[in-house]
Amino acid sequence: MPKQIVIAEKHQVAAVFWKDQIQELVVSTGSQQVGDIYLGLVDNILPSIDAAFINIGDTEKNGFIHVSDLGPVRLRRTAGSISELLSPQQRVLVQVMKEPTGNKGPRLTGNISMPGRYMVLMPYGRGVNLSRRINREEERSRLRALAVLIKPPGMGLLVRTEAEDVPEDAIIEDLENLQKQWELVQQQAMTRSAPMLLDRDDDFIKRVLRDMYSSEVNRIVVDTPAGMKRIKQQLMNWDQGRLPEGVLIDCHRESLSILEYFRVNATIREALKPRVDLPSGGYIIIEPTEALTVIDVNSGSFTHSANSRETVLWTNYEAATEIARQLKLRNIGGVIIIDFIDMDSHKDQLQLLEHFNRCLETDKARPQIAQLTELGLVELTRKRQGQNLYELFGQPCPECGGLGHLVELPGEKGFVSLSPTAVNSSIPPRLVEKPILSPPVAKVNDLPKKEEAKISSPLDLLFHPNYQEQGDRDSNRRRRRRRGSEFSEKENIKSVGISRSKGPSPSPTKEKVTGTAPPRRERPSRRVEKTLVPVDVAMTTLEQDIYARMGISPLIKTEYADQDPRSFMVSVVTAGAALEGNTNGSGSLVNAVITTVDNGDNGDNVPSDGLTIVSEVTAPTPVIEQPREETVEPEQVVLPQLDDETPAAPVAEESAPIETKKRPGRRRRRSSAE
């Protein structure tokens, strides 16, 4: 089948066409290429893996060499560990056998090989080998006998497929050129300083013709007139000064570039996509990974066969042909797993494998089919030859970092990448941090008051929650905390010594500097100021103690119809105190506070049985201290021992309903004055 070669020398890209389809691509990367010979220095030795890193002049990546690839170094000495064969800063002659991929440097070998048109010279090799593609036994015998006669002593030879039916003089001339090239490399290795590049096939046209030209080629197109002359000269050198018959050599002169005119760029774009459509309507998916390449075959919209068996077999046949082409076009190497459509017939499976094997015969990378697994997967391996298409023309996505997808996490707006090397251009709005122009101003209320908040103010009977805000316990808790914070605020300012004139001080408890978290807004106060009606209630000391223990409001002794404690300001006085006044001579009545403690909001020093506590907080008088002495031992308070001045009837009347209101599960609480 005729072939044609299109060479774009300006872009260092060449394509091989067969049946109007691109079968192979040749790309010159300009960096370390397969076949380059370097004089390197041993940089690091790793005895644990029997390998070493060789400095070949690349500032970013060193070359990797295994102990099995040392070649002449291993042959000269007794076999041992790599630390016995190599030493740091030792000069070694190495050749690139695998180009760098990703974060890995080039794979090196000490077994140097010099490829020619018909022969491959192996200076450190042994014996004579022939290409497997030479099928005729007579030709194999002729070439083997010739190679044995002309082989240099101490070296090895490999006869290439192109040497078939070639005269002996051309083969001998090719071998002489290889020997001269090797002698030049040895001279440079003795005189040059390491690390240094000693030999590279810089002539791109010569390299393409050497690897791709065969007797099946009938046309060669190049983009420059100078390139056309060099092609003719090279072909004449290989054919004893004559141009091969039936080969047309052209120079591209169209307005479009040679890559666009022959649809080379379009083919590269399609080859970089994972999906490949088949002529019958099916398609295949090619997914390269770090460990291997996975290929999946799907029938798609193909429904033209009479039964499902023919549909599956026909789709698998088309997929096998296209997969063999894609392996060469994309230069996929390593382990390859193919998931063909399941076939129940064992005969169909064998036919598919035979057809697939015939399609792979034209591949120079020598793919080998390993087996057909029980799950219907075809395993094969293909020799790596340089970089694949993804490494040559692709790079990791800056958005996803090469993962192939972005993620949107719960509670976040926008998609982000999971790769730390990705540069996210669309960062979620909530993650964008605004610059802070000035440090946050600390408020006095933000000062630490963990310890000071435990200090309670003196009890005041007039503002006791049980009297003033009975039934509104939620707001009562907030109000008590607010009063406690105001009290602790003064204590903090005195103890810490913070002055407002010295500038703001950040608070570690209230405000936190985060990305774009809005400042916390204070909840507006819902307190409504009410005008309280002053009420004077005459009570003895014992009555005050009993009312406080039972949680009874002194308003019961008044004649007001509305006895809501939140509407009155109660003043409790002892018998005759209204006439005499208090002991400090101010003329004001004795103030008292009744504190109600809820079971769910206990302090550190307050019992948890929900009793009411009475305490007086004005200037110390005999009237105020009397209940404190009696409450120390509450068991001594007995109703029959009341004084004559205390009316017994009201106490009995008040105590009777109190006993009826007691519940079985209620416990009595000691006074806070104790």
Curated annotation (Swiss-Prot):
Pfam families, alphabetized: RNase_E_G
Cofactor dependency: Mg(2+)
Disruption phenotype: Essential, it cannot be deleted. Knockdown experiments show decreased amounts of crRNA precursor processing.
Ranges of compositional bias, category Basic and acidic residues: 484-493, 509-529
Enzyme Commission identifier(s): 3.1.26.12
S1 motif domain segment(s): 35-117
Co-factor binding comment: Binds 1 Mg(2+) ion per subunit.
Reaction catalyzed: Endonucleolytic cleavage of single-stranded RNA in A- and U-rich regions
BP-aspect Gene Ontology terms: defense response to virus; rRNA processing; tRNA processing
UniProt keywords, alphabetically: Antiviral defense, Cell inner membrane, Cell membrane, Cytoplasm, Endonuclease, Hydrolase, Magnesium, Membrane, Metal-binding, Nuclease, RNA-binding, rRNA processing, rRNA-binding, tRNA processing, tRNA-binding, Zinc
Enzyme class: hydrolase
GO cellular component labels: cytoplasm; plasma membrane
Annotated Gene3D superfamilies: Nucleic acid-binding proteins (2.40.50.140)
Annotated compartments: Cytoplasm; Cell inner membrane
Motif (C4 Arg-rich motif, probably responsible for interaction with PNPase): 665-673
InterPro entries in the record: NA-bd_OB-fold, RNA-bd_AU-1/RNase_E/G, RNase_E/G, S1_domain
Residues annotated to bind Mg(2+): 296, 339
Record membrane topology: Peripheral membrane protein
Major location category of this protein: cytoplasm
Entry-linked CDD domains: S1_RNase_E
Biased composition (Basic residues): 663-674
Function as written in the Swiss-Prot or TrEMBL entry: Endoribonuclease that plays a central role in rRNA processing and mRNA decay, and probably tRNA processing. Acts on 9S rRNA (the precursor of 5S rRNA) and RNAI, a molecule that controls the replication of ColE1 plasmid. Upon expression in E.coli does not purify with endogenous degradosome proteins. Prefers 5'-monophosphorylated substrates over 5'-triphosphorylated substrates. Complements an rne temperature-sensitive mutation in E.coli, despite being considerably shorter and not able to interact with the E.coli degradosome. Cleaves AU-rich sequences in vitro, tested with psbA2 mRNA. mRNA for psbA2, one of the core proteins in photosystem II, is degraded in the dark under control of a cis-acting AU-rich box in its 5'-UTR. RNase E cuts in this box, suggesting it is involved in this dark-induced mRNA instability.
Family: Belongs to the RNase E/G family.
PANTHER family: RIBONUCLEASE (PTHR30001), RIBONUCLEASE G (PTHR30001:SF0)
Assembly, per entry: Fractionates in a 250-300 kDa region, which is too small to be the equivalent of an RNA degradosome, as occurs with E.coli RNase E. Interacts with polynucleotide phosphorylase (PNPase, pnp), probably via the C4 Arg-rich motif (residues 665-673).
Name under which the protein is recorded: Ribonuclease E
Species per Swiss-Prot/TrEMBL record: Synechocystis sp. (strain ATCC 27184 / PCC 6803 / Kazusa)
Name of the encoding gene: rne
